[in-house]
Each structure stands twice: as structure tokens, then as C-alpha cells.
């Protein structure tokens, strides 16, 4: 699974963006977060995710925090 860093979070709107190792930003919805509470996520945290395509661009599914 690809890894990246949470680049932007809009907690009140229920979504954010992950920047992957190549610098591409992937949209993610709060419903894609696994094993963590969306409201407790913070920008700069490292995650792994499933890369998905959508009509609006790169999207992240199955978002999980990385330990350490």
C-alpha cells in the first residue's frame, strides 16, 4: 500500500488530503479512515492508504495511521 503524510484536514467538513511520496495529493473522506477517529487526526501524521481514481482526481481509501 502507498504511504504518505496528511497534508490538509478540514475536520468540520469531514475530509482531508494525503500527500504521497511522489508529492501527489489524494482526497480522503472521513469514512475511509480505519482504526482511528477522524476528528483526532492531525496534519503531518504518516498514513498508508489504498490509491483510487475518481472523476475528480486521486482519492485515498482504507486510510490507516502508521506507527512511529
What are these regions (language model features)?
Residues 13-18:
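Short aromatic-glycine-enriched beta-strand elements
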Residues 10, 22, 64-67:
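A generic structural motif
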Residues 52-68:
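OB-fold/S1-family single-stranded nucleic acid-binding modules
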Residues 4, 44, 60:
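Residue-level signature of catalytic and energy-coupling elements of molecular machines
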